[in-house]
A protein has these predicted regions:
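Class I SAM-dependent methyltransferase Rossmann-like catalytic core
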Residues: 15-88
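Class I S-adenosyl-L-methionine
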Residues: 57-61, 217-263
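A short acidic, Gly/Pro-enriched loop at the edge of an enzyme's catalytic core
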Residues: 155-169
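A generic alpha-to-beta junction signature in SAM-dependent methyltransferases
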Residues: 86, 110, 114, 202-205
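A short glycine-rich, Lys/Arg-flanked "PGG" loop and its adjoining helix->strand segment in the class I
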Residues: 183-205
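Class I SAM-dependent methyltransferase SAM/SAH-binding core
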Residues: 91-93, 97-157
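A short SAM/SAH-binding and catalytic strip from SAM-dependent methyltransferases
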Residues: 166-189
């Protein structure tokens, strides 16, 4: 970890200053053959019925993008079921959006809730990491943002001026320092309590914050962070969504969810 602590701030600063970006990113080979069987097929058909947007994905996405969004949509659907279907997603803000390739899943939830025209935004701290294809996260994200009629920005959520949203998501936030270092960020970005507080501050009254964590240890740490938030604000109510499963696609870790409702 010593080298990560030493070099990450340097490389992150270089990426942020250079802001590597080039035009031309697109999906090269769209079109997916759906080959699910058994329980996976049953669950996929269920998602298609609830979220009609999924049908278009098979024509417009490549396989990797398709599988990614099916996985995330399955998790989002489980969050919705936990709310009893009462929560209207409305405007949406995703914090820590990476390359925003799962924006389609967010938009599908909005469309299903008659919120197709609602705002959808993503923010990512490390947006200029360069992939092997020569394009940056920003390049990928802007392509997906254009196709989903959403907005994407590179910046620090703790400092950026952002509008509040009815639904705010944190998918796999860094609650421990080691994963953050392994992903190339500096320890200066390790401020989990501040990020949770900020996410809740950006959640509208009557809205919800949805959080997904990897593994029981991260989930326990996440719950402690949320409890501290609630101890300072009597308008917050935490609900454990439990383990988020996916019968369609595989994910290498157990995923646990939390819903925080803001009165």
């Amino acid at each position: 970890m010593f080298l990560y602590r030493l070099l990450n701030p340097l490389f992150f600063t270089l990426r942020s200053r250079i802001r590597w970006s080039r035009s031309g990113y697109r999906i090269v080979h769209p079109g997916v053959h759906v080959s699910y069987t058994g329980e996976a097929r049953r669950r996929f058909d269920q998602l298609c019925m609830t979220y009609p947007e999924v049908q278009a994905w098979t024509r417009e996405m490549d396989e990797a993008l398709f599988r990614r969004n099916v996985l995330v949509l399955d998790w989002l659907d489980q969050f919705r079921c936990q709310t009893g279907g009462v929560h209207q997603s409305g405007s949406w803000l995703d914090i820590g959006s990476k390359n925003f390739d799962y924006a389609y899943a967010f938009r599908a939830v909005q469309v299903a809730g008659d919120d197709a025209s609602a705002a959808l935004s993503g923010i990512e701290l490390d947006g200029y990491r360069v992939y092997r294809d020569g394009y940056s996260r920003y390049d990928h994200a802007m392509y997906h943002a254009t196709r989903t009629e959403s907005t994407y920005m590179v910046g620090d959520v703790l400092e950026a001026k952002l509008p509040s949203a009815r639904t705010v998501t944190l998918l796999f936030p860094f609650v421990f320092a080691e994963p953050l270092l392994l992903w190339g960020l500096s320890l200066g970005a390790y401020r989990p309590q501040d990020i949770y507080d900020r996410a809740l501050a950006l959640t509208e009254s009557g809205g919800e914050l949805w959080i997904a964590n990897q593994g029981e240890r991260e989930a326990e740490a996440s719950y402690e962070l949320l409890q501290r938030c609630c101890n300072r604000n009597g308008e917050l109510e935490i609900s454990k969504a439990g383990r988020l499963t996916c019968e369609i696609e595989e994910y290498p870790a157990d995923v646990y969810g939390f819903i925080v409702r803001k009165k």
